[in-house]
Swiss-Prot record:
Protein name according to UniProt: mRNA-capping enzyme subunit beta
Subunit field text: Heterodimer. The mRNA-capping enzyme is composed of two separate chains alpha and beta, respectively a mRNA guanylyltransferase and an mRNA 5'-triphosphate monophosphatase.
Gene source species: Yarrowia lipolytica (strain CLIB 122 / E 150) (Yeast)
Bias-annotated ranges (Polar residues): 20-32, 41-56
Recorded GO MF terms: mRNA 5'-triphosphate monophosphatase activity; polynucleotide 5'-phosphatase activity
The gene coding this protein: CET1
Length: 386
């Protein structure tokens, strides 16, 4: 059936049929009665509406198919909704416009800010995180560094058991030295594991088989000073040179040692504290001259009266203060001579991050502070010539 013929044919034989144009544009007064329709195949109003709709949807090329469908009254599957099932969009060419569903709402979460177990922290856009322009991983998140994550978990486990008062006295320091096998005699061999990269040593193994010596030759302490002096000076906030004398009174294990520190020249008391060791964790660095030990302790001011055996030592120390930690180069003299390099985390920042429960990234900041501390130790350790 030709729709154009239905609209434009002036032949009186078909003029009584209501045109498609009048159906679309006239007020909804209902479809013509059956008496006005010469087509005996369309036996009802709904049949005519369905027939006209089928013709509009299929076009001129489908006339025969539509006629057969109208005769057989078979259900029709539409490739797109018919006009009576779509929202009106206007007339003319706009009436045939495709009706597409609104685009899906994009996920507005920034994947770089997700705190996934496989990610370490928030990162800038992936296109700026690598010099190749490639994303840092298939997720766009840089995986955490395993040694630092292990140290962070270790620290979190201990800090979580402390009271708010104890947290205010926490000290975390890292020293370079050698992890040694516990053997008889003065000459103890450095730990030799079948690995080629640094790793945290199992705590049970350390307690049963190992000890740690933080003593360095004095020549290496001077070399470490040159390394620190040659580093970028803009990161050094200040330096300090002190000479102190410590009086150490060994107390019970649950109380720790009492230490009175005096100025070596004037004798003025600088500090009176009770220091108690909490835990240690050791990192074996097989390709570097020395290993690393991190020690967690509490140092609280006290007015206790000194008791017990006293030992003294003289400390000649040069300190470099950085944002987040301080580096100490110390020559110790007493019953024996020794030299030590240690870096101590900024306790105010460390505990401030840890206790800030309102910050969803507080442990990310703790981990980053530990990363900075360990990277600074690595920087010096890898430049020493043992």
């Amino acid at each position: 059936m030709d729709i154009g013929k239905m609209i434009n044919d002036d032949n009186g034989s078909d003029s009584r049929r209501t045109s498609v144009k009048s159906l679309l544009n006239s007020p909804p007064t209902g479809l013509p009665s059956s008496d006005d329709r010469p087509d005996s195949k369309a036996s009802s109003t709904s049949d005519l509406a369905q027939q006209l709709t089928n013709e509009m949807e299929s076009g001129e090329d489908d006339d025969d198919e539509d006629a057969a469908a109208a005769v057989n009254h078979k259900p029709r599957r539409y490739s797109r909704p018919p006009i009576w099932a779509t929202k009106w969009q206007g007339t003319g060419r706009h009436a045939e416009r495709d009706h597409r569903p609104p685009p899906h709402r994009q996920d507005r979460r920034d994947p770089r800010m997700e705190r996934q177990s496989g990610g370490s922290r928030a990162l800038p856009a992936s296109s700026t995180t690598t010099i190749t322009g490639c994303p840092p991983s298939i997720s766009g998140i840089k995986p955490f560094e395993s040694v630092t994550r292990t140290v962070t978990s270790w620290l979190h486990a201990h800090l979580s058991t402390m009271s708010p008062e104890q947290l205010q006295t926490v000290e975390l320091e890292a020293k370079i030295g050698t992890i040694q096998h516990k053997k008889a005699g003065a000459d103890r061999a450095r730990l030799d594991l079948p690995i080629v990269t640094e790793a945290v040593v199992n705590q049970q193994y350390v307690q049963a088989q190992c000890s740690f010596s933080s003593q360095l030759p004095e020549s290496l302490l001077e070399e470490a000073k040159r390394i620190l002096d040659a580093a970028d000076p803009k990161f050094i906030k200040s330096t300090e040179h002190t000479i102190h004398r410590d009086e150490i009174y060994e107390g019970q294990q649950d109380k720790g040692n009492l230490r009175i520190t005096r100025d070596d020249v004037t004798g003025r008391q600088v500090a009176k504290i009770r220091k108690k060791a909490i835990a240690h964790i050791m990192i074996h660095c097989p390709t570097d001259p020395f290993d690393i030990r991190l020690s967690l302790a509490t140092e609280s001011p006290t007015d206790d009266v000194p008791q017990g055996v006293c030992r003294t030592r003289r400390k000649d120390r040069i300190s470099y203060l950085y944002d987040g930690f301080r580096a100490d180069l110390t020559k110790v003299s007493g019953s024996s001579m020794s030299s030590e390099l240690e870096m101590e985390a900024d306790s105010h920042k460390l505990i401030g991050y840890f206790t800030d429960r309102n910050d969803p990234h507080n442990m990310d900041k703790v981990e980053e502070l530990l990363q900075i501390l360990l990277d600074s130790m690595r920087y010096v350790n890898r430049r020493l010539k043992a």
